[in-house]
Amino acid sequence: MIDKRDDKPFKLKSKYKPSGDQPQAIESLVDNIEGGEKAQILLGATGTGKTYTMSQVISKVNKPTLVIAHNKTLAGQLYGEFKEFFPDNAVEYFVSYYDYYQPEAYVPSSDTYIEKDSSVNDEIDKLRHSATSSLLERNDVIVVASVSCIYGLGSPKEYADSAVSLRPGQEISRDTLLNQLVDIQFERNDIDFQRGCFRVRGDVVEVFPASRDEHAFRVEFFGDEIDRICEIESLTGKTIGEVDHLVLFPATHFVTNDEHMEQSIAKIQAELAEQLQLFESEGKLLEAQRLRQRTEYDIEMLREMGYTSGVENYSRHMDGRSPGEPPYTLLDFFPEDFLIMIDESHMTMGQIKGMYNGDQARKQMLVDYGFRLPSALDNRPLRREEFESHVHQIVYVSATPGEYEMSQTNTIIEQIIRPTGLLDPEIDVRSSMGQMDDLLGEINQRVARDERTFITTLTKKMAEDLTDYLKEMGVKVKYMHSDIKTLERTEIIRDLRLGIFDVLIGINLLREGIDVPEVSLVAILDADKEGFLRNERGLIQTIGRAARNVDGHVIMYADKMTDSMQRAIDETARRREIQIAYNKAHGIVPQTIKKDIRGLISISKTSHNDISKEEMDYESMSRGERKEAINALQKQMQEAAELLDFELAAQMRDLILELKLMD
């Protein structure tokens, strides 16, 4: 039985106090939640402190909260901010744990079967386990997630019921504990002690939970009784302290007991027989042979090991669900009365809607050609209406709410005033004739003031041509395209803030969540080309990138005024008017946002020693020695980045740059 700690309140720690229209927004949101309002919108302009407002609301309503962002980068940024606001509570991070993922697929036109290929990030897997275990053990939990939280995860009841609960004085033999650990997918490894493993030394069993990365537990037996349980450092074995209760959750989210496994296998066999009969009646002998071979192999693995590659495709049988019934997801791990906050809801809700259809189209092909049983179709993300059925209370957060959110509620709470007094930027509309020379002049003005520039284009070719042109003109510029990975994107933003380059060019990467106070100019090329990237919502989001600097300015290059441009300009002017009036009434002088230059997310520290300039005298080294030092630093930098410790990786990157300049 898991003893859930439900008496610990959320405790917000911050040097800031609500200001501007934050107090009114916080009070309205809290009153509506406590009054039972199901859905409401926080319409917060860029830079008004929406995350701080969300934190204040969470601390006041005191409910377990799920915050959903539309990509890993934004989820990481929010995770870092919530960790700072709630250091004494459980702030968790739940995103897809794949560094690389090629889903299983079949292309009939070329008779090509593509096997599932993936690379799991061990650090993120640990954080996912930490999230689910926290939800089952306590109520003061904030989980920051990407939309991967609506994918199948395994039954929370099976996960909780399989947990092993241990206390000093408990009567249980060492061998019984070992069998229980194997049943919940822990592996015995007396040499390489890592997450999801245990090791045995006489009457001592050491267990490394799947949700930890530095600390494990030592269970000491005296006969058939637990004598003592200690928390230990996993690397050194040094005792940190004694614990009076230890709960060990399964090492995988897909777990079942022996009796349930046999029932599941019987259902898989029955479905297999039915599908084989169908294929044979249709003359699809190759498909029938393929399906029999693959499924019987999986059944054998499930019987022998309790697990098989692709076990999630049998999750309907494992969970005891009916055909078409929605899968269990992270949302099922929350108690009934929980709060959902959707960040950048105009993007995130669109993703939630689109996940199901794309998944089904790919899997149907696998079923039709005998690679998977039809039940594999029920290993899927939730449909939007299924997601809605989990919603008890929800807050949509966006500077530009979408039509869906607007259709869900009439309760819209505006947050327009920035705590720093910053105004929405002034907007110029200029002709596209001679735009390159005009833009170069504007960039040079910003470079002279040590400020940065964002440029957004509509096509990859224009972005590349503009990058080449500006480089020829002596501008330090980078182009951020869609092929750049998340970690690299984070480094590019950091380099821009540090002034390693002055201009960043992109297509659809400059709109939400890129927080660079040093940017004082946003240039929008082809502003009059109506479409997804140049509609009212997209333009307002892009304009918002210049709203964190006191000298923020936006230039739209266009040959005509579109309705979207006019509406975006009018809305920005409306907000400016409100902000100017507030500043005047309260004697506020606008100030550029001050924000530390750090990685977007820092989850854990690497175990590697940082080679600092103080520790090693690089200047007295020979060129060859410095080259060796650079190679060593580059290796450590890569390892730090893989562990998502961007701050350490960035420090090493800066040191490498300095060393290269010495030569």
Swiss-Prot record:
Q: Which PANTHER family match?
A: UVRABC SYSTEM PROTEIN B
- What is the gene called? uvrB
Tell me which residues make up the Helicase ATP-binding domain.
31-271
Functional note? The UvrABC repair system catalyzes the recognition and processing of DNA lesions. A damage recognition complex composed of 2 UvrA and 2 UvrB subunits scans DNA for abnormalities. Upon binding of the UvrA(2)B(2) complex to a putative damaged site, the DNA wraps around one UvrB monomer. DNA wrap is dependent on ATP binding by UvrB and probably causes local melting of the DNA helix, facilitating insertion of UvrB beta-hairpin between the DNA strands. Then UvrB probes one DNA strand for the presence of a lesion.
Where in the numbering of this chain does the UVR domain appear? 627-662
Q: Give the family from UniProt.
A: Belongs to the UvrB family.
What information about domains appears in the record's comments? The beta-hairpin motif is involved in DNA binding.
Q: Which organism is it from?
A: Streptococcus pyogenes serotype M4 (strain MGAS10750)
Q: Can you say what this protein is called?
A: UvrABC system protein B
This protein's UniProt keywords: ATP-binding, Cytoplasm, DNA damage, DNA excision, DNA repair, Excision nuclease, Helicase, Hydrolase, Nucleotide-binding, SOS response
Give TM regions.
none
Q: Which SUPFAM superfamilies match?
A: C-terminal UvrC-binding domain of UvrB (SSF46600), P-loop containing nucleoside triphosphate hydrolases (SSF52540)
Q: Where, if anywhere, are coiled coils annotated?
A: none
Q: Which CDD domains match?
A: DEXHc_UvrB, SF2_C_UvrB
GO term, biological process aspect, one: nucleotide-excision repair
Annotated GO molecular function terms are:
ATP binding; ATP hydrolysis activity; DNA binding; excinuclease ABC activity; helicase activity
Q: Which SMART domains match?
A: DEXDc (SM00487), HELICc (SM00490)
Oligomeric form and interacting partners: Forms a heterotetramer with UvrA during the search for lesions. Interacts with UvrC in an incision complex.
Give start-end ranges for motif Beta-hairpin: 97-120
Residue span(s) of domain Helicase C-terminal = 435-601
Region described as Disordered: spans on this chain: 1-23
- Amino acid composition bias (Basic and acidic residues), ranges on this chain: 1-10
Q: Which GO terms describe its cellular component?
A: cytoplasm; excinuclease repair complex
